[in-house]
Amino acid sequence: MTIQAMYPGTFDPLTYGHLDIIIRAHKIFDKIFLAVAENSQKHPLFSLEERVIFAKQATAMLDYVTVFGFNDLTINVMKKKQVNILIRGLRNRSDFEYEIQLAKINNYFSNEVETVFMISTDIWACLSSKLVKEIAQYGGRIDHFIPNFIVEKVIEKLRNTEKKNKNISFL
């Protein structure tokens, strides 16, 4: 029997911390659906399409990973994919408090869904996509945190965003 799990997230951009969770999760699960979310509560730097492309490129060598984008409740996507296990990475206590709320609400909608929490490896415990973008915005090196092919895309996108914002006048 194949054991499948879904790892949803915004992945804006996908980091080595995310990849570490995927690789470690494969010790438990045969197949992992990497579900790239269009999150209405966030304002991602990259479009859903771009983030899906990055995720596919970053996981191309991992034959057990299937990447797709979605714009729906995670629980609905899980039902469509017939997946009952949700993977979530935890870096710290605040992640846990947030993720426990999501796990409980997912169980409310479907008592067949189980959430598996994976503790971040120490080296990635302080890493977030938001932090990567902030470091890049101020000219810091981000090549230790994200795949090399994404580094230039982040820098380019931030430059373009900065140029657009300079055209805005404040009173």
Curated annotation (Swiss-Prot):
Its cofactor is Mg(2+). Pathway: Cofactor biosynthesis; coenzyme A biosynthesis; CoA from (R)-pantothenate: step 4/5. One of its GO terms (molecular function) is pantetheine-phosphate adenylyltransferase activity. ATP binds at residues 10-11, 18, 89-91, 99, 124-130. Its EC number is 2.7.7.3. The record marks 18 as: Transition state stabilizer. GO terms for cellular component: cytoplasm. It catalyses: (R)-4'-phosphopantetheine + ATP + H(+) = 3'-dephospho-CoA + diphosphate. GO terms for biological process: coenzyme A biosynthetic process. Substrate binds at residues 10, 42, 74, 88. It is found in: Cytoplasm. Its main location: cytoplasm. InterPro entries: Cyt_trans-like, PPAT, Rossmann-like_a/b/a_fold. Homohexamer. Belongs to the bacterial CoaD family. This is Phosphopantetheine adenylyltransferase. It comes from Blochmanniella pennsylvanica (strain BPEN). The gene is coaD.
